[in-house]
C-alpha cells in the first residue's frame, strides 16, 4: 500500500535510486496504490550522468510492496521493499533493464514490457 510521501526504491537502470510518491493516480481522492498501479513520483536520489535527474517528476508503476498482494487461491506475496519502475508519457519503461522479481499482476495491467525485461516473475 503506497500512499503520498512514501519512499520507494527504483527497480530499473534509469539512473534514479530512490523516488517519493507525490500522487496516486486513478481517482480524485484515491489514497493507496498497490502492485500494478501508476503513481506520480519525484526523484530524490540519482546517480551522476543518468537519464533522470534529482527533482524530476515522472510517472512510475509499483512493482513490489511490503504490504503484499492476495491471489485468488488465497496465497499472499510480500516483498522486502517497496519498488517502482519509472515510465515515460506513453506508459512504457524508460529503462532497458529491470532488477529483482516482479509479479504476474503486472500482466493484467498491460505492462508486458516490464515482465519481459524482469529476471523473475512470481
Curated annotation (Swiss-Prot):
The organism's superkingdom is given as Bacteria
Q: Which UniProt keywords apply?
A: Ribonucleoprotein, Ribosomal protein, RNA-binding, rRNA-binding
Query: Which Pfam family is an annotated match for this chain, by its short name?
Result: Ribosomal_L14
Instruction: Enumerate the Gene Ontology biological process terms.
Output: translation
Gene3D superfamilies per record: Ribosomal protein L14 (2.40.150.20)
**A GO CC annotation given for this chain:** cytosolic large ribosomal subunit
Is Secreted one of the keywords UniProt gives this record?
no
Q: Name one GO molecular function term.
A: structural constituent of ribosome
Keyword rRNA-binding listed? The answer is yes
Q: How does it assemble?
A: Part of the 50S ribosomal subunit. Forms a cluster with proteins L3 and L19. In the 70S ribosome, L14 and L19 interact and together make contacts with the 16S rRNA in bridges B5 and B8.
What is this protein for, i.e. what is its function? Binds to 23S rRNA. Forms part of two intersubunit bridges in the 70S ribosome.
**Family the UniProt entry places it in:** Belongs to the universal ribosomal protein uL14 family.
Annotated NCBIfam families: rplN_bact
Name of this chain's protein: Large ribosomal subunit protein uL14
Q: Which organism is it from?
A: Acinetobacter baumannii (strain SDF)
Give the encoding gene's name: rplN
Amino acid at each position: 500500500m503506497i500512499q503520498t510521501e512514501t519512499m520507494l526504491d527504483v527497480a530499473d537502470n534509469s539512473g534514479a535510486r530512490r523516488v517519493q510518491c507525490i500522487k496516486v493516480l486513478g481517482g480524485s481522492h484515491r489514497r493507496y496504490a498497490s502492485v500494478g498501479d501508476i503513481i506520480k513520483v519525484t526523484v530524490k536520489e540519482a546517480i551522476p550522468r543518468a537519464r533522470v535527474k534529482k527533482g524530476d517528476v515522472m510517472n512510475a508503476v509499483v512493482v513490489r510492496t511490503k504490504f503484499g498482494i492476495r491471489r485468488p487461491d488465497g496465497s499472499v506475496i510480500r516483498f522486502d521493499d517497496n519498488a517502482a519502475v519509472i515510465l515515460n508519457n506513453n506508459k512504457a519503461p524508460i529503462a532497458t533493464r529491470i532488477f529483482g522479481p516482479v509479479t504476474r499482476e503486472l500482466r493484467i495491467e498491460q505492462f508486458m514490457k516490464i515482465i519481459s525485461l524482469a529476471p523473475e516473475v512470481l
